[in-house]
C-alpha cells in the first residue's frame, strides 16, 4: 500500500437520509450497508446468519461420495487424500486425514511438490498410489480438470471422489462423485465454498452417517484457516461456520494450530479473520511456496504438543525465508523499473529474472500492482529455456482474458480476472510483453494512472469510539465478499507525524478536541506534510502492554482543500461550507457554485435531510447535486 501515491478519490453514493432504521447499528454503519445494497432483512442476516439447509439437498453427488467413504471406513480400507500446495489444499488434506482415521479408514496424504511435480493430481501419482494398494482417491482443492489422471484411475479400477472449486471442463472427466459449488443451486449458501469447505461438508456428512461426531471436532478449526487463507467469500455457509469457529479457535484441540498461535503471539483471546489472514495463513502458505507441503499436514495432524511445536518452528523459519525473499525480489524489481526513469512504466509491467523463486513471485507481483496500479507479471526461470510467471491485476482489467488473447505465445496458462499464471518460452517473452501492453494500454488510458480510492462512509473523529467498534464487529468477519469498510475523515489537523523503523508513516490527527492515531505501512510522508489532510482508513485495535486503543490504518492521505469540485456530466461545480457568521443561520450551511458563478445555498444538521428553500432545488438533478455536495464536504456519512 502506498498511501501517498497519486490518487483519484471516488465519492460514495447518495442514499436515503436515515437508511435501514430498523437495524440496531450506528447511522454510519447502516449507511455503509445500504450503499452495499443491503435491505433490512439482509442486514440482519449478515449479523445473524440463518440456519443452513441439509447439504445433501444441494450437492447431487454427496450421497454417493458419503456411501463410498463410509464403506472404506467400515472395511478399514486404505485411501489417499490428494491435495495441493496452497493453504486451502493443505488444510483440506489435513482435515480429511484427521477426520477419517478415527472413523476407520487408513487415510494418507498425497500432495505433489510445487517445484518437482506441479499442480494437482497427475498420472504418476495415480500409478504410484495404485501400486501401494490404494483403490480410493479423494481429491481436495484440485482434480476436476485432471482428465488424464482421472482416466488412468478409471483404467486401474480406482474410485475417485473429486472435491474441487475450480472451473469444471466442458467435458467432465470420469469420476465416482463430484462435490463442487457449481453443482449446487445458484442461490445455495454452499456456492462460495473453497476446497476446505467441500472437505468439511464431506467429513461432516460421513461422521453424521457413522454417528461419530467427535471425529470432526478439529475439522471446523481447519475449515476456518483454509477458508480465510484461500480468500473465499465470507458469505453463506462460509460466514456461518466461520462465525461459529472463530469463537473457539484459540482453544483448538489441534496442537499444530495452538503451536502456530503461540509462535505468532496470539491465542490468548478469540481470534479474528485478520489473525488468520496475517498471522497463521502466511506461516502455512510459506511451506507450500518454499518447502514440502506434507510438513503442514504433519503439523495439523500431530497430537503431541512438543512435536507440534517443533513442526511449527519449521513453518515459522520458512515464513521468515519467504519474507526475506519477497523483500529482496521486490527491491530488485523496483530498481529495474526505476532504472528506466520516472514515467516510463509500461501499461503492463512484465519483469523477468531467472534466479527469482517461483514460490513467491505472486506475492511480489501483488505488491508491484499496488505500487504502480497496473497489471503485473513476474517471470522466473523454469529450465529448458522457459519461464514460469505469476500475474496480478487491478480491478477492471481481466488478466485471465488477456492471457487467453496470448494463448498462441504460451505453453500453458490459467487464472481468473485478478490473478493468473503461465509458462512461456524465453524467445516469446518480448512478443508477449508487446501484446500485453497493447491490451492494457486502452484500459489504463480510460482508468488513469492514479490509484482509485473508494471510501464508503465519512466519519468525524469523535464518532470513532468503542460503540462504533462494537457495531463494526457485528458485521465481521471481513474478507472477500464482505470487505473491511473503508472510512474517510475530512479536514483533519496533522498534530504530529513521524517515520517509524521499516518505513511506516505514523500520524496523530485531530478534529476539534478529538485526537486519533493513524499508521500507514510501508509509506513515505507527503512532502511537505500539509497542516490539514483528508484520510481514508480502516479501523483496528492496537494492543500494547495491556492497553487497547482504536487505531486508523491509513490507505490514503491527501492535502485538505476547503472547496470540493463536483461533476455532473460535463458540468463542474464548486462546493464549500459557509462560516456560520456569514450564513447568519444555524445549522451548517453550504454553497454550490456553477461555472458561471451562480450559487445555491442549503443547510442541514444531523437530525434532518438537506434543506433548501430555493425552488431550483426541487429539480431532481439539483437535489441530487446538493446531496452529493453534503457527502463530499463531510457533512453526511
Question: Could you tell me what each predicted segment is?
Answer:
Residues 1-31, 35-53, 57-60, 556-577, ...:
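Terminal, basic amphipathic appendages of nucleotide-handling enzymes
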Residues 12-136, 156-157, 207-429, 441, ...:
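Hydrophobic helix-and-loop "lid/oligomerization" segment in the mid-to-C-terminal part
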Residues 31, 106, 239-334, 370, ...:
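Acidic, two-metal ion nucleic-acid-processing modules in DNA metabolism proteins
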Residues 85, 142-143, 165, 354:
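Active-site metal-binding loops of divalent metal-dependent hydrolases
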Residues 106-108, 159, 177, 517:
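Conserved beta-strand segments of alpha/beta enzyme cores
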Residues 129-132, 139, 145-232, 403:
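Conserved phosphate-handling catalytic cores of large alpha/beta enzymes
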Residues 150, 187-190, 267-268, 366-367, ...:
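A generic local secondary-structure boundary/capping motif
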Residues 165-166, 357, 416, 504:
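Histidine-centered active-site/metal-ligand motif
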Amino acid at each position: 500500500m502506498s498511501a501517498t501515491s497519486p490518487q483519484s478519490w471516488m465519492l460514495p453514493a447518495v442514499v436515503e437520509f436515515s437508511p435501514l432504521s430498523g437495524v440496531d447499528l450506528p447511522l454510519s454503519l447502516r449507511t455503509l450497508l445500504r450503499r452495499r445494497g443491503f435491505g433490512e432483512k439482509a442486514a440482519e442476516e449478515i449479523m445473524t446468519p440463518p440456519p443452513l439447509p441439509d447439504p445433501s439437498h444441494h450437492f447431487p453427488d454427496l450421497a454417493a461420495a458419503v456411501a463410498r467413504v463410509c464403506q472404506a471406513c467400515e472395511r478399514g480400507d486404505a485411501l489417499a487424500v490428494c491435495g495441493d500446495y496452497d493453504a486451502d489444499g493443505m488444510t483440506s488434506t489435513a482435515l480429511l486425514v484427521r477426520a477419517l482415521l478415527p472413523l476407520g479408514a487408513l487415510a494418507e496424504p498425497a500432495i505433489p511438490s510445487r517445484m518437482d511435480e506441479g499442480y494437482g493430481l497427475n498420472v504418476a501419482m495415480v500409478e504410484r498410489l495404485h501400486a501401494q494398494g490404494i483403490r480410493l482417491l479423494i481429491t481436495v482443492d484440485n482434480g476436476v480438470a485432471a482428465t488424464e489422471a482421472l482416466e488412468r484411475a478409471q483404467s486401474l479400477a480406482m474410485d475417485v471422489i473429486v472435491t474441487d472449486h475450480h472451473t469444471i471442463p466442458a467435458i467432465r472427466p470420469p469420476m465416482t462423485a463430484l462435490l463442487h459449488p457449481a453443482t449446487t443451486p445458484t442461490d445455495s449458501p454452499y456456492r462460495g465454498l473453497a476446497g476446505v469447505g467441500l472437505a468439511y461438508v464431506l467429513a461432516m456428512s460421513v461422521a453424521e452417517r457413522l454417528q461419530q461426531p467427535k471425529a470432526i471436532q478439529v475439522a471446523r478449526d481447519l475449515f476456518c484457516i483454509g477458508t480465510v487463507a484461500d480468500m473465499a467469500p465470507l458469505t453463506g455457509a462460509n460466514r456461518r461456520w466461520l462465525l461459529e469457529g472463530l469463537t473457539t479457535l484459540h482453544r483448538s484441540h489441534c496442537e499444530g494450530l495452538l503451536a502456530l498461535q503461540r509462535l505468532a503471539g496470539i491465542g490468548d483471546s478469540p481470534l479474528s479473520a485478520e489473525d488468520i489472514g496475517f498471522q497463521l495463513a502466511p506461516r502455512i502458505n510459506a511451506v507450500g511456496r518454499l518447502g514440502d507441503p506434507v510438513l503442514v499436514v504433519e503439523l495439523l495432524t500431530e497430537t503431541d504438543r512438543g512435536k507440534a511445536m517443533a513442526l511449527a518452528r519449521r513453518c515459522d523459519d520458512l515464513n521468515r525465508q519467504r519474507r526475506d525473499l519477497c523483500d529482496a525480489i521486490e527491491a530488485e524489481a523496483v530498481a529495474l523499473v526505476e532504472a528506466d526513469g520516472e514515467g516510463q512504466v509500461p501499461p503492463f509491467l512484465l519483469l523477468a529474472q531467472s534466479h527469482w523463486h517461483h514460490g513467491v513471485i505472486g506475492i511480489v507481483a501483488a505488491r508491484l500492482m499496488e505500487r504502480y496500479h497496473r497489471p503485473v507479471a513476474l517471470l522466473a526461470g523454469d529450465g529448458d529455456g522457459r519461464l514460469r510467471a505469476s500475474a496480478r491485476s487491478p480491478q477492471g482489467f481481466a488478466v485471465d482474458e488477456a492471457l487467453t488473447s496470448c494463448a498462441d505465445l504460451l505453453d500453458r496458462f490459467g487464472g481468473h480476472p485478478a490473478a493468473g499464471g503461465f509458462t512461456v518460452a524465453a524467445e516469446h517473452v518480448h512478443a508477449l510483453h508487446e501484446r500485453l501492453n497493447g491490451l492494457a494500454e486502452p484500459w489504463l488510458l480510460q482508468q488513469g494512472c492514479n490509484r482509485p480510492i473508494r471510501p464508503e462512509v465519512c466519519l468525524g473523529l469523535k464518532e470513532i469510539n468503542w460503540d462504533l467498534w462494537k457495531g463494526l464487529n457485528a458485521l465481521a468477519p471481513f474478507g472477500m465478499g464482505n470487505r473491511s469498510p473503508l472510512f474517510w475523515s475530512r479536514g483533519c489537523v496533522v498534530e504530529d507525524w513521524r517515520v517509524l523503523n521499516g518505513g511506516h508513516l505514523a500520524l496523530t490527527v485531530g478534529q476539534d478536541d478529538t485526537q486519533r492515531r493513524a499508521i500507514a505501512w510501508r509509506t513515505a510522508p507527503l512532502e511537505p506534510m500539509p497542516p490539514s489532510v483528508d484520510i481514508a482508513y480502516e479501523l483496528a485495535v492496537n494492543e500494547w502492554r495491556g492497553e487497547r486503543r482504536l487505531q486508523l490504518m491509513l490507505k490514503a492521505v491527501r492535502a485538505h482543500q476547503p472547496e470540493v469540485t463536483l461533476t455532473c456530466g460535463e458540468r463542474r461545480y464548486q462546493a464549500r461550507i459557509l462560516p456560520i457568521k456569514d450564513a447568519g443561520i444555524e445549522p451548517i450551511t453550504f454553497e454550490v457554485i456553477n461555472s458561471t458563478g451562480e450559487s445555491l445555498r442549503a443547510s442541514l444538521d444531523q437530525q434532518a435531510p438537506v434543506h433548501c428553500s430555493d425552488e431550483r432545488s426541487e429539480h431532481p438533478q439539483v437535489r441530487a447535486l446538493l446531496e452529493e455536495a453534503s457527502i463530499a464536504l463531510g457533512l453526511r456519512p
